[in-house]
Amino acid sequence: MNQNRTGGVSKVKNKSAAPVQITAEQILRVAHENQQTLPKAPPKQVITDQEELEDYRLRKRQQYESLLGRNRKTAAIYIKYAAWEESQKDLTRARSVFERFLDIDHRIPTVWIKYAEMEMKNKNINLARNIWDRAVCLLPRVSQLWFKYTFMEDMLGNYPAARAIFERWMQWKPEPQAWNSYLKFEQRLKLFENTRLIFEKYILVHPYIKTWIKYTKFEERLGNIENARTIFQRAIEFLGEDGNDEQLFIAFAKFEEKYKEIERARVIYKYAIDHVPKSRAKDLFDTFTNFEKQHGDRIGIEDVVLGKKRFQYEEEIKKNSKNYDIWFDYLKMEEINGEIEKTREIYERSIGNLPPTNEKKHWKRYIYLWINYALFEELISKDMERARSVYSECIKLIPHKEFSFSKIWILYANFEIRQLNLDKARLIYGQAIGRNPKSKIFDQYIHLEIELGNFDRVRTLYEKYLEIMPDNCDAWCKFAQLETELGETVRARAIFELAIQQPNLDRPEVVWKDFIDSEIQLKQFDFVKQLYRKLLEKTNHVKVWIGFIKFVHSIKDKQQQKQRQQQQEEDGDSNTTKKDGGDDDNNDDINKPTREIFIEAHKSLSNSDKEERLLLLESWKEFEQTFGNQETLNQVLKKIPQRVIKRRSDGNGGIEEYFDYIFPEEEKSTQTSLKLLEAAQRWKKLKQQQELQKQQELQKQQQDS
């Protein structure tokens, strides 16, 4: 047993021959086929004397000339041709090839570079110098040529010539990379005065902030602090409004901070905050904040942060004063800061920005400014009279004829409740119901009176509620539930009876369900059956039938359990076993009412949707599997429809497949219709044959005549 579980390579269990055998002949054939597909290398040519060499050169030159004849302007062929001539040590011919192409097109830098590199490789420095000179004269805007030219002179140690080339290049005002190369060249030679002169030209040609900062860093590396400071000041004056960039001021302030000039740095930061547009000063504020954290006190840091945020919010408000999200953020910051008067001032400014139209979608955010204002006065400033005034002014401002907000009425009433002004709170709720009654207001008012125990007032409110909104199912159900909890079952039943008689309920199924559940809790089973019958008269829905069936079966099940308990109490445990065996024989009698309702439902739904009929049959099948026998189950299985796949047009010129169900009673009618269709097709085919024969006879008669 354990030997088969040891590690290592597993043994072959099946040692019989494989069904397909591979022979050596097959292996050789495949290898030969693969070998034939490989590309064959050209044969090596061995040159033994000068005559063969000249012949080889002649053929090679003829090949290149033939290529050039077909591709006269292709630079790559000329470069390869010249490289081959160079490999043959025939530089004259190589130069001739390059010159031929340059006569055709001198605007390709690669050809000039290859030409000059060939001369440099063969140590023809003067020739290379002439080529570079010609190239930069013809193509002065190609930086690569200048770089190569200066690099050659630099490598040769000919620094005056390299400097002269740089000067010629700078006259063309090239990109910053060229100036940086010139600066590195002079710094490498430690000619710092020359470097300063180059920087002075550089900042005029490219008057960018990066250029000025690079100039200051150069002076700083040399230890000329005053010169660096002067350059910063020159940059701010020279650039003017263009110099109002945070990076220049940050670099200047960090420079002063580095050399312990803290007050200078602080002045620079404050000057920058006043002059740099705040939309471009994010890093400036962050850097200033970090600076104050290192060198300032807590008050200074907080002032910096608050000043930054205030300015940002004010800028946003200038752009769009109707952007209420900005107002919310601004007010939240001021509330945290704790300045009551400042916060109150901003609240007054914010509520002055009325929405553009009297549409509720524009007021939804705006109304929260008033709500937050009232809560601020109540909870933070503790000014109750001002809070009451805010609520009152807000209610006056809302166009109640067009729309209203339940939330503001409820908050106002709750505020008065917290001030123990119950009469005032009732008055507010009454005004809300009179102006624009809504479910939330009724619910809150009713909840208040329930908490106070004024049930007569609650009944009055529910009556008013249902008078205004008779289609509100929740109101009917809550009213009936209240009466049930108070023990007034007759009142509750009457309310439900009135509710189900309403023609336009928004969710009638909720009322029926609560009515039925209420009567089940009261154990009025006969009345529940009557309710189900009434509901089925209104709607012949499969879910109602299934609910009715489950209810009837649950009653019978409870009655059966009661009988068993009584028998156990009377006869004892020994006789219980016998009785239980007898109960199995009476299952059919107990389940008979449930089965009868299934049959009734099946007949009632015969003209309904097939999906609903199938749902009922599936429920019936589960019932018979659990409580029935094989005979009753087979009767249900015979009624189960057959699912088939059909096709129909999807309305867009296409065909879609869908599932359909064919019930057993429909199969007979379907078969009859199919037979009629087949007979019609046979008759049509016979008629076509007869017409064809007549046409053939007519054609024969015409031919004979």
Curated annotation (Swiss-Prot):
One of its GO terms (biological process) is mRNA splicing, via spliceosome. Its main location: nucleus. One of its GO terms (cellular component) is U2-type catalytic step 2 spliceosome. HAT repeats lie at residues 55-87, 89-121, 123-155, 157-188, 190-221, 223-258, 260-294, 304-336, 338-372, 382-418, 420-451, 453-485, 487-521, 523-554, 597-629. InterPro entries: HAT (IPR003107), HAT_Syf1_CNRKL1_C (IPR055430), Syf1-like (IPR045075), TPR-like_helical_dom_sf (IPR011990). SUPFAM superfamilies: TPR-like. Pfam families: HAT_Syf1_CNRKL1_C. GO terms for molecular function: RNA binding. Residues 559-591 are annotated as: Disordered. It is found in: Nucleus; Nucleus speckle. Keywords: mRNA processing, mRNA splicing, Nucleus, Repeat, Spliceosome. The keyword Repeat applies. Coiled coil: none annotated. Belongs to the crooked-neck family. Involved in pre-mRNA splicing process. PANTHER family: CROOKED NECK-LIKE PROTEIN 1, PRE-MRNA SPLICING FACTOR. Identified in the spliceosome C complex. This is Crooked neck-like protein 1. It comes from Dictyostelium discoideum. The gene is crnkl1.
